[in-house]
Amino acid sequence: MERKQRKVYQGRVVSDKMDKTITVVVETKRNHPVYGKRINYSKKYKAHDENNSAKTGDIVRIMETRPLSKDKRFRLVEIVEEAVII
């Protein structure tokens, strides 16, 4: 039996205060069904970060996985771009 394709999202880390867990906000754009205006949507996901390598502001890629806790269903795949510290 074949496994379903796992969802992969790219987003920005908004919190890294938890141990081995990051909060990632994923922003998407959709057209309004009647008026056609582009609308921004955002959703927060908790993701597993085994090495605590991602920091707040980083752009990361996360992948769907088995449930790891009450809220965690994603894991960190890679850090696409590190945050610039000013």
Curated annotation (Swiss-Prot):
<dbReference type="InterPro" id="IPR012340">
    <property type="entry name" value="NA-bd_OB-fold"/>
</dbReference>
<dbReference type="GO" id="GO:0006412">
    <property type="term" value="P:translation"/>
</dbReference>
<comment type="similarity">
    <text>Belongs to the universal ribosomal protein uS17 family.</text>
</comment>
<comment type="function">
    <text>One of the primary rRNA binding proteins, it binds specifically to the 5'-end of 16S ribosomal RNA.</text>
</comment>
<dbReference type="InterPro" id="IPR019979">
    <property type="entry name" value="Ribosomal_uS17_CS"/>
</dbReference>
<keyword id="KW-0689">Ribosomal protein</keyword>
<keyword id="KW-0687">Ribonucleoprotein</keyword>
<dbReference type="GO" id="GO:0019843">
    <property type="term" value="F:rRNA binding"/>
</dbReference>
<keyword id="KW-0694">RNA-binding</keyword>
<dbReference type="Pfam" id="PF00366">
    <property type="entry name" value="Ribosomal_S17"/>
</dbReference>
<dbReference type="InterPro" id="IPR019984">
    <property type="entry name" value="Ribosomal_uS17_bact/chlr"/>
</dbReference>
<dbReference type="GO" id="GO:0003735">
    <property type="term" value="F:structural constituent of ribosome"/>
</dbReference>
<dbReference type="GO" id="GO:0022627">
    <property type="term" value="C:cytosolic small ribosomal subunit"/>
</dbReference>
<comment type="subunit">
    <text>Part of the 30S ribosomal subunit.</text>
</comment>
<dbReference type="InterPro" id="IPR000266">
    <property type="entry name" value="Ribosomal_uS17"/>
</dbReference>
<keyword id="KW-0699">rRNA-binding</keyword>
<protein>
    <recommendedName>
        <fullName>Small ribosomal subunit protein uS17</fullName>
    </recommendedName>
</protein>
